[in-house]
Amino acid sequence: IRKKYICKKQIKKGISGTRELLKNFKNGSSIALMIDQRVSEGMKCDFFKEKASTTTIPAQFAKKFDASIVPVYIERLKNNYFKLKIYTPLKFQENESIEKITTKLNEILEDMILHNPEQWIWTHNRWK
């Protein structure tokens, strides 16, 4: 569903992926980031009361480009139906730190997971 309806073009992690992401963003494209992934170049922020390596790209884009962040949650229902919840766009103040924004996004992700924990697909160690 994510690839078919939300994000048709998927960009790989890493420096070259970040460059491509930036190029697409500057050309007016919306971007979707899966922030529940463990990243080696991230920041250690609280995630379920433990420090977890977390991408700072959403926070960097919010600060550098005054970009809104729109959290999205997809819930699996019966018979191959899905419910898509689109949250109110988040705007952050110029003086908010990358760490504060990243931590806030982790808190939102925690709430999404706790809403339906059996639907969170987690195959790697975020706390490594």
Residue ranges, per PLM feature:
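Non-catalytic C-terminal accessory region of glycerolipid acyltransferases
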Residues: 15-128
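Membrane-interfacial amphipathic helices and adjacent loop/beta segments
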Residues: 1-15
